[in-house]
Amino acid sequence: MNKVIKIALIGKTNSGKSTLINNIVGEKISIINKKINTTQESLIGIKNYKNIQIIIYDTPGINFLKVSKTFNKNLKVNLWSSIDEADILIYMIDIIRFNYKNIIQDIKKLSEVNKPILLLFNKIDLIDKNEILPKIDLLKDIKNITSFLSISAKKNIGIKKFIKFISSKSYNSKWIYQNNEISNKDDIYITNECTRNAILKFLHKEIPYNIKVKNTLFKYLKNNDLKIKQSIELDNKRYKPIILGKNGNTIKRIRECSQKDIKSIINNNIHLYLQLDTKNAK
């Protein structure tokens, strides 16, 4: 009998959610960048482990739990939708930036949905192991926290244990996704994200995180190479010279970085072409 378990990865920006989901799935499906709230929508990763399908919701930063008119409403809706869908909430903590007060506030808000919460400490490779237990002791009596685990998503420490633990919470059900699916997003979405990630990698201080990349061509050639054309949509004309860079050097670096990432995901030679779209720019 097949089984299913749905989890939502929740945590502060840069706690390591995207790194973890990419590690579990085995492909770079979720954008990784140090720019705040780079996860634009709730991407789903799928891991089939034995007869169990693990469905993982990668959510925007936990800041969107709070009520604020300044936050993007769509991101807030995406976060709460993922929480509603999940069977277990995985609250991920960057153990290097452990903040008791913030954790208590977040858990209190998450407890409103009355679902089991697993506290997952990440980046344990960067601290002394003896520092972990005292932090668990501080939090062990908080309502709805049912378990504690520690990992390093980047160094692949504790990932197998995490997968086994999540699998133990699965229940009998038909699989929601096909055996060969690793995400609810298609190749076009993921390749667009590669380019958006590259833009933020080189220009995170100059360009807004919600910059959009649109696909205009996705075509396999006779030799099985993949030709991709993408349009970078700018809402302000002042971003154009920034992205182009001196003598076009910046956009060249963006293209090369994105092309390399796409090739590593799709395993084909990639011919990537980028253009800047300013028709709706101010």
Q: What feature does the model see in each segment?
A:
Residues G16, G158, T250:
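Conserved glycine(s) of the Walker
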Residues M1-I83, I88, I93, L226, ...:
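Conserved G1/Walker A P-loop phosphate-binding module
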Residues D187-K282:
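P-loop NTP-binding site
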Residues I55, L118, H271-Y273:
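A structural signal for isolated positions on well-ordered beta-strands in alpha/beta enzyme cores
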